[in-house]
């Protein structure tokens, strides 16, 4: 007769599903109250299990936070890689990546990157997560640099542009409310329009050059005063 416990792969899948449920609920509470104000008792209560049950899936609260932030960062990395793999103009890839970024930071694990972050964790864990963040920054820099080279993005410092984009998009995860008047899609549309319009190259674009001097990009002829 078949084992009532199921096959080994089935048991592994069930355990993974339950572990993700633990992490997701913990992320929700971290986002609501902060890491230090959250207890494992609250996580267990919301899951309708005992606290000792949690230790079958996680070691401690530090591990939970690390995994929550790590999942969020992995999803951002996968989304950006997917958009880049689609090809096309760098500005189009960048806008698509920004849209995916907003979608993820308004979800439980992505929001946890912003609201809880890696600061409460031990140094080794912080270093790992910050190296993942650095990779996301490199994606943005490369796209901006490519866009400048192909002419779809205005001449600017790719590092500053990448920091500006990532900072603005990440902060959405701080102030976003699921019960707010705007959906993640609507927020993404408005924020990306503001950010991307500042990047798109145009004949009347003015950029800030080295030393803070402005460089006019306008190609239209100046009108000669009459009268």
Show which residues each predicted segment covers.
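Conserved hydrophobic residue
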Residues: 35-36, 149, 153
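Amphipathic alpha-helical segments used for helix-helix packing
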Residues: 93, 105-124, 141, 174, ...
């Amino acid at each position: 007769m078949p084992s009532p416990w199921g096959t080994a792969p089935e048991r592994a899948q069930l355990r993974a599903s339950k572990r993700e449920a633990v992490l997701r609920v913990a992320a929700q509470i971290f986002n609501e109250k902060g890491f230090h104000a959250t207890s494992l008792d609250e996580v267990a209560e919301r899951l309708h299990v005992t606290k000792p049950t949690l230790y079958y899936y996680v070691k401690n609260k530090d591990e939970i936070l690390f995994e929550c932030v790590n999942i969020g960062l992995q999803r951002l990395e996968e989304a950006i890689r997917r958009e880049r793999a689609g090809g096309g103009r760098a500005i189009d890839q960048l806008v698509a990546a920004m849209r995916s970024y907003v979608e993820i930071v308004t979800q439980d694990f992505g929001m946890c990157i912003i609201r809880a972050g890696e600061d409460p964790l031990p140094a080794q864990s912080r270093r790992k997560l910050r190296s993942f963040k650095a990779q996301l920054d490199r994606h943005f820099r490369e796209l901006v640099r490519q866009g400048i080279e192909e002419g779809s993005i205005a001449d600017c410092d790719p590092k500053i542009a990448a920091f500006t984009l990532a900072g603005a998009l990440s902060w959405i995860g701080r102030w976003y409310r699921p019960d707010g008047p705007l959906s993640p899609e609507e927020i993404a549309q408005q924020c990306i329009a503001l950010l991307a319009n500042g990047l798109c190259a145009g004949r009347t674009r003015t950029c800030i050059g080295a030393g803070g001097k402005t460089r006019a990009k306008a190609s239209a002829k100046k009108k000669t005063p009459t009268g």
